[in-house]
């Protein structure tokens, strides 16, 4: 007979059963998926000072991470990282880009760069609002 359990201490193996099951179903649903990783870095003397990463898939750029070292912020590097990711995504045939942030200030920056809010979730975590934004990449 099946038996339920609820735990704070699930094993890596138990969690792997869940994640692999979800991924297997997702891959089956997205049989025509064409995911390709994408990353952009700016280095100074060999150290990464800014960059972004994500993937292109289903005619969309999904930006997962965008980061600028604290001492290099507010001088346009974040905008440049996004521009470079978007340019490569266009070459790959992406029609739009999706990005998320928990920062109201960063959401305002993305808005100035042409991103439009598609969803906001107030009090998402710790009082922060989750901003989900999309930008058309077609000319």
Residue ranges and their predicted role:
Residues 18, 110, 115:
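Conserved active-site tyrosine of GNAT-family acetyltransferases
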Residues 74-87, 112:
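Conserved acetyl-CoA-binding loop-helix of GNAT-fold acetyltransferases
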Residues 1-10, 139:
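Conserved N-terminal entry element of GNAT/NAT acetyltransferase domains
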Residues 35-50:
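Conserved beta-hairpin
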Residues 98-100, 116-134:
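Conserved catalytic-core motifs of GNAT/GCN5-like acyltransferases
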Residues 47-55, 60-67:
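Conserved beta-strand in the GNAT
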């Amino acid at each position: 007979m099946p038996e339920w359990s609820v735990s704070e201490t699930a094993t890596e193996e138990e969690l792997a059963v869940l994640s692999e099951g979800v991924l297997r179903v997702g891959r089956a649903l997205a049989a025509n998926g064409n995911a390709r990783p994408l990353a952009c870095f700016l280095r100074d003397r060999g150290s990464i000072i800014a960059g972004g990463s994500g993937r292109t898939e289903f005619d969309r750029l999904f930006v997962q991470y965008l980061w600028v070292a604290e001492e290099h912020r507010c001088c346009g590097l974040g905008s440049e990282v996004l521009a470079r990711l978007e340019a490569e995504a266009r070459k790959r045939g992406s029609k739009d880009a999706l990005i998320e942030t928990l920062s109201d200030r960063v959401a305002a920056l993305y808005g100035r760069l042409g991103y439009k809010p598609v969803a906001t979730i107030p009090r998402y975590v710790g009082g922060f609002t989750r901003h989900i934004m999309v930008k058309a990449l077609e000319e």
